[in-house]
Structures are given as structure tokens and as C-alpha cells.
Amino acid sequence: MESKVVALNRESRRWKKSSFNELLKRARNQKSTICNRFTRKNTPNILVTFTSRLTLLRPTFFNFACWHSAMEIFESMSFSVKFDKELLPIGRHGLTAGWLIESLGQLLNSDNIRNIKCSQLGTDGFVSQIMRVVIEFTNNQTKKYIVKMPETTNIKAALEKTTQQKMPEGADEQFIGGLTMFFNREVEYYAMEKIPGLRTPKCYHAQQWDNGKTTGAIVMQDLEGMVSVPYYESLNLQQIASIGSQMLNLHLFSIGMSDEWRQKFPFPMELIDTVSNMTDIVKLYVSRNPELEEGFSKVEKMYQDRELFTKVLRDSHKSLGIDDFLCHGDLWFYNLMWIPRKSGSEVASNHLGSIIDWQNVHTGNICEDFCHMLTFCCDTEIRRQAENTFLPYYYNQLKAKAVEAGKKLNLTLNQFLRAYRRNFIAHALHLPFIVSIMLCVKPADDEIVQKIRNQMSGALWSAAQFAVTSYVCVRVLKFLYIMCKSVLVHFITPKHDLDYLKDTWTVITGGTDGIGKAYIEELCKTRGLKKFYLIGRNIDKLNNTKKELVEQHGCEVMCHVHDFEKDDLSALPKDLETLDVGILINCAGIAPHIIGTLTELPEGLASKILRVNLMSAVKMTEMILPNMVKKKRGIIVNISSMTGWRRFRTSVLTRLAKLHYPSSPTPCQMNTEELEFVFSVSFQCSLLPRSPRMKLKKRTISSLSPLKTLPNKLSELSGLIGKSQRAVCNMMFRLPLEHCSPFGFSKYFSSLLLCSEFISIVLPLIKRRTRERIIRVFIISRLSIFVHFYHDFFLLNAIFQIKKFSCELNFLESFF
């Protein structure tokens, strides 16, 4: 073999010079793609095939193999169709026509293929290359396909043009991670069941992208003939209605969708990373358009708040109690394909033909796609008309269709519109980034182009100002709402009548100081209750409290020493199960001595907190509630951590790891869900207090200035300055007005707004009159306004899905 190669190489050198020009001339006459590549410059890299599979020849054998094959091909003056199919490249990523034919399989008869043409569409996306492949058959028929492949070239070029700076080496790697996830998400979408009635391109083949191993590609229907609306124009109301008819199918399918959809398409946090890192681009855009600086200064801080984007994009609907719906995620001009007004026209009609580009599909806010579309694709006038007329109409249509389909829509019109307003904020802030990329922020040389840009900028900042105005209005209204509720609680709402419980026992855990002791004083001094059963861990404090109650108020007191942190729950007195208990106050609680997340706390501290703060309330309620139900009377008061309703970021580690450890609204879920299920108990009220919007650094309690100026009496009762780190939050019995008057705090705070935030926790209205209530259950918040830490942890949310308390106890005790 080696001698044959040497001989053939000698032969090839003899005819190479004289035959080269003739070969090129004859190749051009054949108009063959592969022959046009035969030049001295690119010859060493050419692909030559002798079978149906491609082979990359080694350089040592190249001269002979290349020229010998070329001589055989050109001397016969014919090219095999098979040869052309294998070698025709599709795009820049190593795919060929042979790959396409193999992927389509039985959809094509490869023996009847006469010619294959490939061209790049001029409307490539930012993160993909789009190729149109035309296959001609011997019977004069043609088939057209679109091949979509992921790449970073376009987005990189757009950013370089925008910033007028060359991207640094390795910048591609920053895009590839997120791009891989998004592209593979679209592949998975096309692999799922087709959503009835939703117009999307047909997908013939899709393969996932594994960078460095497998080229990602999607082969789909060619929508040639359809058009898109240019991004510098606006959709009209008829077009918005046509889009709504398709969203109707998507949202109707989302009601009761399978868990597989939720698992495959969770909300992509990469989207949060993208929108929260766009400040520099927007600043550059504003700097080149000075008329925007005043408006931008009002929202600049919002761009730097990643938590804000997380709330309004991912969590805004959850806090409203709305289920997840499927979202397209990128519903804007170039992903909406329209039927043209007439054949061959480039003007879009009012009939939507197809929705493309599903790489950002996810579960989330039902209004997300409407926010995106109305913000990015409509001028101010059209958007406001759509908000006032289209959105309510769409909700009614969805509700009617759900009834027809036999599905239950757990959504009110008020929830729907509130979900829209919340999500709209993020898209209004995102719009300048997209506009700057589309316009490349460089001032236009043409006056007409600059006029169009100014119109777009006007629409952009109108949307942004609407978002900011909405935010300010909500804050003001919340402040007024809090003040009105506070006045109602302290001056209008009557005290609860406790006379029917005077002959029953009041059981209090943690009643020797702080909140628990404040309850005892209120009950015995002003409510006439004389029977108390105290449970605490300090025998001296228990005896002192007992002595004080007996000598000063003539109370009957029983005590039991129990440390919820160390003692087993089974050691609690059994007589509690048969004792005639009228009021149960679960007040025992501890707090960590350091600020940190679950992973940052010392070993064993989390278990102690769970045991004291959670299991004490669970076990005490389990023991006492059945007898209350039997006697058809009773009150349960649970003191909960403020962080049960608001989670705090406590460290840099949390931000780096993108972790959020929400504490559990411990007694709230237990009493509103589990007790009702187990004991068929109805509740008079439940309290979900709002938390202060205060971002405090890691400080000791005594270093916080508001604490030094609080009235002494309030400080004594609340225990804010001291070991207990608690505050009186007595909603059921109401402390005297001189201690908790909402107006008494204002002079001790630097602003009325801060005062309102404090009042929103200390003095919320909880009384809701209802019918046929047997057991009254109150959930009260223990303040953590000045020290933010986690009393409870994320795993409690899963624990409370268990329906029986015995199962809960066994699980937790084995866990500890």
C-alpha cells in the first residue's frame, strides 16, 4: 500500500500542474458546489467521499487521494447525486444535507432527489442561525424545510455594535451555558404532546445541543409566505385579539396540566440573571439620549435590585394565590408570524398564522406573555386601550371556555389584573435594553430614522413611568390602608367577650416573661380570668409568676417545668388532654444567636429552633384541641415568627448560591389547613402580617437607633431590648392604648413611612366576623423587625403537607 501511494504521488505531481486549470474550468461548467472548493488555498481541508459516508483524509495521503478522486470525477463528466447530498453544508456548524436526509427518514425518498439548495434567512435570531433547505425531486416537486441551529454570533455582534467595544476573549462561553438550556428547552417542547388549537410550526426532527459533542438542530416547517410586523410599528387591537385567541388555547391547556410540564419547564432563573445585569447597556443608551436622563434617574435603583425582578417575574402571581400557567416567554414582533393581507404582500393582516421560537417556554404568571407583548409591540395608546378593554374580555373568554371544557379556573378578574400590573413592571424595565440593542444606541445619521427612535423612546418611557407611578400609588394606598386598620382596631373594634371562658383554664407556654407574661397580665387584670396553667423551662421564673398571680390577683395557678429545646414531647403533662381548657397560647420560642441561613447555622441549632418554635405548637394543639372541639368552645393563639411571611437575605453566600430559604408560616398553615381537615374546625380569623421593608445589616440589637427612643413601658412589655428579642403583638386582648397607640410612635421615628411599616406589623386588623364559628384560632406575629434571621426553615413547607399530626410528630422526631 505504501509503495502504491508513493508511485501515485509521483504520478500526481506530473499531471497536477497541467491539469489544474482545466479541472477548474470543467468544474465551473458543471456548477457543482463541491468543485468550486477546489483551489490551492482550501485544498488541504476538503472533504472527499468514496462511499455514502464522509471521510476526512489524512494530510499525508491527501495529494494523491484528492487529485486522483477529482480526476476520476471530472473525466467522467458526471457527479453523483449521492455525493452532492452528503457534502452540501447546512449552516456553519458541521451539519450536511446527508444529515438532513437521514433525519427526515421516511418523509423523503432519497433516490428521487435531483438537487438540494441551502440558503441563510436574513431574519436570523439573536441566538440562532436559520437555514432554508429546498429539496428538488425528479418529478419536479419541491419540499422546503427550516433548520434552526444555536449560536452566539449574532448576539455577540449586536452587543459589540451597541457598546462599540470588542467583546473580550472567551465571551462566547458566557452565552453558551444559558443558550444550551434555552435551546434544549425548545427541543423538549416539541417532543411534548401538541397543545390543541395552538398554531405552531410542525417539527420534523429535533436533537439536543451538547456543546463540543452534538450540534443542536431543529428541522421544522417552512412558513414562507407569512410575514412579521416590523419592530418600529405597533400592533393594532384586532391583531392583539388574534394573539389572544391563541393564548386562550395555551392557558386553557394549562388548567390542570400534568406534572410533567411543570417539571420540564420550570421558571428559568437565567432569565432573571439576564434582566438584572442589563444596567450598563441601558445607561449607555440613556447617555446617548440626554432627554431620557430625568426619567431614568427615577428607576435606576430598580435595575440593580435582582430581588425585585425575581418577585415580579417569577413570584408575583404566587403571592396572589394564582396557579402556574404555561408561558411562551418571548412573545414579541419576530416570534409572531402573520398571514399577509394578500398573496405576495409584505404587509401583515389581522390573522395570526403561527407562534415560533419556544425556547423560553416555562410555567409562570398567566399575564407574562401579555405584559411582554403589550410592552414590546404596542404604542402607548394601543397598550392602554388593550389594558382597559382586551384584558377583561380575555379573562371572561377564558372563564367561559374553561366551563365548556369542564375545567375549574381558580382565578378572579381582580387577581388577573393584579398579576398583570405586577409583572408589567419587569417588562417595562426590560424594554430599554431591547430597544438599545435593536437600535444599537448610536445616534442615527438620518432624520427620519431618528424620529422613529424618538417615537419608540417616548413609548418606552411612558411604559416605565406607568410602572413607577403604579408602584408609588400602591405604596401610598398601603400606608393609608394600614393607618385605617390601626384606627379601626384601637378605637372602633370591640374587645372579644371572654366571659364564657371564666371557669376554664388558660394554658400558656413561655408565659414567664415577654409576650406570654403580657397576655397573663391582660387576662387576669382586665378580663377576669383566674385559672392559669403555666409551662416553662425555668422553675424560679414559674414560681415567681405563680406567686405574683396568687397574691396580687387571687388566681389559681398550676405549673409544669418543660424545656421544649431538650425534653421529649411525650413528657408533657397528660392531664392537659382532659383538662377543661378554654384558651391555649403557644408562646414558647427561641431565636438563633447569629444571623444566617440554614446551611450557615451551627450544627444542631436548626433542630432546636424547629423543636421549640414548631413542635411545641403542634404538640400542644394536638393535645388540647380535641377536647375543645368536644365542648364546642375555645380559643387558640399561636405566636409566630415574622419571617414566617417574609424571607430575608442574610449573607453574601445566599446571593452567590442563588438560594432562598423561606421560613414556614408555622401555625398559619397548620391551623388553616391541617386542623380543619383533621378536626373539621372552622376559624374566626387568621393574621398574615406584612413585614417591614427594611434592609438591615448585621448589627447587635442595642446598636439600632429606633430601639433607644421607644417608650420605656413598651420596651419592658415587648422585650425588644433584652434576651427574649420579642415584641408584644396582642391583637386578641388589646393592650391599653397608651402602650400601643399608632400615633404614639410617629415622633420616635424619622419618617411617617417607617412608622407605618412598624404599625403594619404591631397593629394589623384581624377580626373578621363569620357565621357558625366554634373554635377561634389566632395567629399572631412575634416581631423580628430589628433582627432578621430565620426562625423556621424551608423544609417545613413540605412537612405541613402531611395530613395527620401523628405522622408529623413521628417524622420530625425521627429527623431530629
From Swiss-Prot:
- Endpoints of the signal sequence: none
Task: List the EC numbers from the record.
Answer: 1.-.-.-
Classification via Pfam families: adh_short (PF00106), DUF1679 (PF07914)
Disulphide bridges, residue numbers: none
- Primary residence: membrane
What CDD domains is this protein classified in? 17beta-HSD1_like_SDR_c
Q: Which SUPFAM superfamilies match?
A: NAD(P)-binding Rossmann-fold domains, Protein kinase-like (PK-like)
What keywords would UniProt list here?
Membrane, NADP, Oxidoreductase, Transmembrane, Transmembrane helix
Q: Where are the transmembrane segments?
A: 743-763, 777-797
Looking at the keywords, is Cell inner membrane present? no
Q: Which residues bind substrate?
A: 641
Q: Which residues form the active site?
A: 661
Keyword set includes NADP: yes
What subcellular locations does the record give? Membrane
Binding-site residues, NADP(+): 503-534
Q: How does it sit in the membrane?
A: Multi-pass membrane protein
A GO cellular component annotated for this chain's UniProt record is:
membrane
Q: List the GO molecular function terms.
A: oxidoreductase activity
The record's similarity note reads: Belongs to the short-chain dehydrogenases/reductases (SDR) family.
Q: What is this protein called?
A: Uncharacterized oxidoreductase dhs-27
- What taxonomic lineage is listed for the species of origin? Eukaryota, Metazoa, Ecdysozoa, Nematoda, Chromadorea
